[in-house]
Amino acid sequence: MSALRAVFLLAALALTAAPVHAQQSQQSLRMWFIDMEGGGATLFVSPTGETLLVDTGNGGQNATRDANRILDAMRDAGVTRIDHLVTTHWHGDHYGAMREVAGRVPIAHFIDHGPTVETAQAAVDFLRDVYPTLYQGARHTVAQPGDRIDVRGLDITVMTSAKRVTDRPVQGGGAANPYCAGFTPQEEDMGENAQSVGIHVRFGEFRLLHLGDLTVNTEYELMCPNNPIGSVDLWVVSHHGQPISNAAVLVHAIEPRVAIMNNGTRKGGQPAAMQVIHSAPGLEDLWQLHFSQLSGQEYTVPGVFIANGLDEQLEAMPIAPITPPTGRGGPPAPAHNGQAYWIEVSARPDGSFTVTNARNGFTKEYR
C-alpha cells in the first residue's frame, strides 16, 4: 500500500468513526450524582445535550466547595450551561451554592415550589434579596404537580410540589397500591421537606424517580390508594436515606432495580430506612455517595458501591451503626473536604443502564 493511499484510508476511518461515537452519545441519558456531603446535586444531560440540575448543595463556608464540585461534573459532561435548575426545597443543603453556581455558568430556567414555609433567616434573606436577582432575565416557574419540564428526548413530570401531589399517573402507573394498608403515619411535617418538588423522568423504557426530601405522610398521599408511578429502574433515595422519609408504601411499591443514596459521613443511612430499602422487592443494588456511620457495616453496602471516604481514613469501619448525636453539642461528623467522587449513570432507551463509581472505576451493567 502506498503512503498516500494509507493517509487517505486513515482519514476515511476517522471520518466514519466520529459519527458512531456521536451517535452513541446521542442515544444516552447521562447523570452525575455529585457528592455534596449529605446535600443534594444531580446533573442530567439529555441525548440532545440539554441539561437539568436538581439542587445545588450546601451554602455558607461550603458553598465554594460544592459549586466547584458541580462545575467539575459539568466539565466532565462537556456542558457549559444549565437549561433547567430544579430546587426541590429551601433547605441550605439543597440550594446553598446556587449563587456561586449561577455566578459561573448561565442558568436559563429556575424551578421551585414557591416561597419557603419556614422562618430560617438564611432562606428568608436569600429568597428576598438574592434569588430574584438570579432569575431576573431568565425563566422562573413555580412548579405544580402534573407539570412537564421541557427537555427534548425526555418526559419529565412533576409528581409533587408544595405538599401537593399529582392526580394523574405517568405511563405504567395507576394500579392499586397493596402497601397502603400497612402504612403508619408519622407526626405531620409542616416544614420544607414535605414541600419538595419531586420528578419522574422517562427516557424510552428507562424510568427514574427523584422526590427530594419528601417525607412519609406526603409519600402516602402520593402513593395511595393507587400507585401513580408504577415501577422504576433507578430511584434516588429520598432525604439522604433518613427514616422520616422512605416509607415502604413508596419504596416497595415502585420496585426500584437500583437505588442511589446521596448521604453524608454521618447523615442518612439510619437502620430503619436501610431496612426498608434493602427489602424493596426487585432491588438489585444500592449505591452510596458515602459510607455512613449511622449504618455501620451492619446495613451498608460493599465498598465497590461507595463513592467517597474520609479525609482521615479510619483503620476500621464500625460494624454496628451509631446513634446520631442530638442538639448542637455533639462532635462534628467525620470530615471529607478533599477529592470528591461522583456516581455516573448512562441510560439507554431500551431501559438498560450502566452505573460507574468514579472513585474506583467499578462499573455494573443493568439490562
Residue ranges and their predicted role:
Residues 21-367:
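Non-globular, low-confidence helical/coil segments that flank catalytic cores
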Residues 6-17:
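Bacterial N-terminal signal peptides
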Residues 1-3:
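N-terminal secretory signal peptides that target proteins for export/translocation
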